[in-house]
Amino acid sequence: MHPLFDFRKAAVTLAAAALAGSAGTLAIFVLPSLPAAGLSAIPFAVFLSFLIVPVWFVGILVVGYPAWILVHASGLRGWLTATLVGALLAAASSFVFATQIMGMGQPPAAVNGWVNGRQTIRNGAYTEASRSAERATLMLVLVAGVVGGACAGGALWQVACRRELSR
């Protein structure tokens, strides 16, 4: 069987890519903010890790892997080309996903909240400062994680293909 269609290897590669992208995104986003935020960043990091892993796995599985197959089926054999196409499509789908989930989940009406001295929740409604910061943060996290996961998947896939073809 051609290594491109070995779904067992594909599943392992996709899982590794999702975890690599998630870990990379979490490190990029959380580690610089830990000294300034103290322990308050740790619960947010845990929340992000639960959000990131399924988003990257679905993004890579639903968008990245089909893009990889389409690029190879069209005659382009470069793993970098397939990785970039998959990463761009996955980033676009993540952008749509993120804009859809931004309106979900309102806090209770009596809740007020501040982050770094800025009020982000006023009487149970997110303030504009909160919405713009959340959108920018979520876009950065989604795009960085998907691209990181797609690149990790492309590199691992290339290694798997070379080993299979060298046998």
Positions of PLM-derived features:
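Juxtamembrane/disordered regions of integral membrane proteins
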Residues: 1-167
